Amino acid sequence: MTSGPQTILHVCSRDLIRQLRDRILASHGYSVVSTLSVTEAEDLYAKSHFDLVLVDVEGDGRIPQAEKLCSDIRHKDPEQKVAFVCNYRVSKISDCPNEIIRSEFNPDAMIEGVKELLG
């Protein structure tokens, strides 16, 4: 068990949204490491511990990329918590993620989803 704030790896291809979410998460006491790139997310994950990997799945081709990232992470650590952030239905075929947080334009819903998932 670690002391200090819980750490979130936030993956979002939309820079403005990424920055906004990072600020919202930080204002609620979370330590946030974020990236625009799935490839960079994999590198960051390999180097550090994260309590949650939060992946934005909005945009063309983002769901398959997010599912692959989730699968790769779970292969390395089956206990890692992963959540997708979206405002529409995501495929239920995948065993990833732990949670789908539907909160695209609602910061309170995003924080509530994160809190529920992290306990």
Say what each PLM segment does.
Residues 14-17, 55-62, 89-90, 107:
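Short acidic, S/G/P-rich loop/turn micro-motifs used as interaction or catalytic elements
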Residues 54-75:
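Conserved phosphotransfer microenvironments
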Residues 46-48, 72-80:
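Conserved phosphotransfer cores of two-component systems
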Residues 3-6:
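Phosphate-coordination loops involved in phosphoryl transfer and adenosine-cofactor binding
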Residues 36-52:
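Acidic, metal-coordinating helix/loop segments flanking the phosphotransfer/catalytic sites
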Residues 14-33:
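Two-component/phosphorelay signaling modules centered on CheY-like receiver
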Residues 83-119:
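Output/docking surface of receiver
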